[in-house]
Amino acid sequence: MSLSITDLNVWIGDAHILRGITLEVPDGQHVGIIGSSGSGKSMLSLAIMGLLPEGARVEGSICWDGRELVGASERDLRSLRGSQISMMFQDPATSLDPLMRLGKQIALPLRRHRGLRGADLREAIDRALAEVALPDPARIARSFPYEVSGGQRQRVALAMTLAASPSLLIADEPTTALDVTVQRTVLDLLDEVTRERGVSLLFISHDLPVVARMADRVIVVDAGRITDDVPVEVIRSAPDTLSDSARSIASAARALDSVFERIGAVRPDSQPGHAPGEAGECEGEPASSTDNERNAHE
């Protein structure tokens, strides 16, 4: 399944947020979208998901597997979210329900889109948690979000987005809210799992080295417009061929690298990852009540 966007324009009130966006995400490709704050990159992801603010005006086409999403009913969009297109948000602390056990949250898309119940549902929850390399999946399933670490919460969020086997995953700054020592582990996991499954990835960030590490192709957005759409190798090897905005982003990344080099430090996105349970990712306190045991997969 592929995503095709043609001449997409979005207005919020009088503000023209996205201006003539045209792009393709072929089946199985990893595409990075980079831009500064306010460039419109996150608004693009919300437009694809049909989650724009009330009152937004949209013109153009967003075509998913031959289906037009602009103007589609909420019912039709809801049937696509999670089952075919999923989104991983920036901060798992806000994207997860703080009052619901994590196992129950993973169960939601499995029930809704795959119709699983009983033992089949419990097995699917365990598989989803194991796939994202969480230690002691049974404990994680019966825990509330505040009882596990930030890195573990983001892994749970990844498990939720992939639970119903979508064909496209949109990841909007998925590691920004994490401690730098955990970021690489989560990025490696996201890249590995999506490539193994053949899932298309739309990876949104302001950090060029991270985008270049995750993507096959890089799209630069500036002031609501696409200024560059190039293979990732061009960003590394031929920056002089890029637009002024892309060169500015590349220059800032090189300057930051030189600062880290001068002070003898390692850039956060280049730090070695930590295996589950090693220093760098707190495991959180285990949920221990018998009530947790009974309710983990209800």
Q: What feature does the model see in each segment?
A:
Residues 57-68:
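Conserved ABC transporter NBD signature motif
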Residues 163-167:
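A short, proline-enriched helix->beta-strand linker immediately N-terminal to the Walker B motif
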Residues 106, 158, 169, 182, ...:
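Hydrophobic anchor residue at the start of the ABC signature
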Residues 211-213:
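A short, surface-exposed alpha-helical micro-motif characterized by mixed small hydrophobic
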Residues 87, 237-274, 297:
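C-terminal boundary and immediately downstream tail of ABC-type ATPase nucleotide-binding domains
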